[in-house]
């Protein structure tokens, strides 16, 4: 059976993400963050607890998780099955790709349903556009028995996408969904980062979980520009804030109950730790894990996930931190570019 136009678009996203992987990872922005070593951590690895409480009713067993990637096609089904199996094995939370497609192509749901089938007791974040209706949100959460809902905000991607949305009046709808849903709502960028202004707007609309998702990983500007054969948006290929810049933006404002999640350009356990030092409560990883799965195979990603869990725990012990949530007390210095950004933005 021929796949729908929406499914074909999902396959294009996967193909182009792989095509541009090496290009977008030429710059490793977390290199601009150096942690200060303390020779006396006074800690054992047994003292370290990797659990993280993101909300009253949302706890994850490990501070990094498998971030939203794909869904809606046969190829996506295969990927999601493997990712869900590994999430189950390693007790990792996992976010789905955007479920918005299922309202237009109901047959595509099987590529998402497989995630819960392979990981019946795990933590799963459903994912929808920020303009989703309450019925769509309730349906997505119910179908997957999701523990949380990610609402992605992706204005830059949509504007470059030839068939993308052009209406970005999202805040009131986000606030409404937060107030009506029984599961925590995470508002997430898609690789363009967030400013303190954006974060403050979300706070005033009752959002308490924010994924700043900065530039440095999967580049949807490049992906959608490649798909757009009418208008060239090449000037926007480096649009937005990097993940470290976005974390500094978040750190500069009074957060209250708001918890920050980081994603975008995370390629090592040390990046996970650095994100925590800069204020992230948890860290999502998508492109790096997908690249291993597609190019090296299931067993290689299985080994990588296990190694990351061991290394993150040992790095916490090295820094004298009994949990991920106390990393913000670790001292650090910034490289020239990131320090200049922080000073010009009055972030430190």
Swiss-Prot record:
Residues annotated for FMN binding in this entry: 68-70, 98, 127, 188, 213, 218, 286-287
Acyltransferase as UniProt keyword: no
Claim: Aminoacyl-tRNA synthetase is one of the keywords in the record: no
Catalytic activity: isopentenyl diphosphate = dimethylallyl diphosphate
Disulfide topology: none
Top EC class for this record: isomerase
Enzyme Commission number, as recorded: 5.3.3.2
InterPro entries (alphabetical): Aldolase_TIM, FMN-dep_DH, IPdP_isomerase
GO molecular function: FMN binding; isopentenyl-diphosphate delta-isomerase activity; magnesium ion binding; NADPH binding; oxidoreductase activity
Example GO biological process: isoprenoid biosynthetic process
Record-given protein name: Isopentenyl-diphosphate delta-isomerase
Name of the gene this protein is made from: fni
């Amino acid at each position: 059976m021929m796949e729908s136009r929406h499914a074909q678009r999902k396959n294009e996203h996967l193909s182009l993400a792989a095509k541009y992987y090496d290009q977008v990872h030429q710059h490793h922005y977390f290199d601009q963050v150096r942690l200060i070593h303390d020779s006396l951590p006074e800690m054992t690895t047994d003292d370290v607890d990797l659990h993280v409480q993101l909300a009253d009713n949302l706890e994850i067993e490990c501070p990094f998780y498998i971030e939203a990637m794909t869904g809606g096609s046969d190829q996506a089904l295969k990927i999601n099955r493997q990712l869900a199996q590994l999430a189950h094995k390693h007790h990792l939370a996992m976010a789905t790709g955007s479920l918005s497609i299922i309202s237009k192509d109901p047959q595509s749901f099987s590529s998402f349903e497989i995630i819960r089938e392979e990981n019946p007791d795990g933590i799963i974040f459903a994912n929808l556009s920020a303009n989703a209706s309450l019925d769509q949100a309730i349906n997505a959460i119910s179908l997957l028995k999701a523990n949380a809902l990610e609402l992605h905000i992706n204005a830059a991607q949509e504007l470059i996408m030839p068939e993308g949305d052009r209406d970005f009046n999202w805040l009131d709808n986000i606030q409404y969904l937060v107030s009506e849903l029984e599961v925590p709502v995470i508002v997430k960028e898609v690789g363009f980062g967030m400013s303190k202004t954006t974060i403050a707007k979300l706070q005033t609309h009752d959002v308490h979980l924010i994924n700043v998702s900065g530039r440095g990983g999967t580049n949807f500007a490049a992906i959608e520009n490649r798909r757009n054969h009418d208008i060239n948006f090449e000037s926007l290929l480096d649009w937005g804030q990097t993940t470290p810049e976005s974390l500094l933006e978040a750190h500069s404002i009074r957060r209250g109950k708001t918890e920050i999640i980081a994603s975008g350009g995370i390629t090592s356990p040390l990046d996970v730790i650095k994100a925590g030092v800069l204020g992230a409560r948890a860290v999502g990883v998508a492109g790096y894990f997908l690249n291993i799965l597609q190019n090296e195979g299931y067993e290689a990603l299985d080994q990588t996930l296990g190694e990351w869990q061991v290394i993150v725990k040992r790095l916490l012990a090295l820094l004298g931190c009994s949990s991920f949530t106390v990393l913000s007390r670790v001292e650090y210095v910034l490289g020239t570019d990131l320090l200049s950004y922080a000073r010009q933005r009055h972030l430190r």
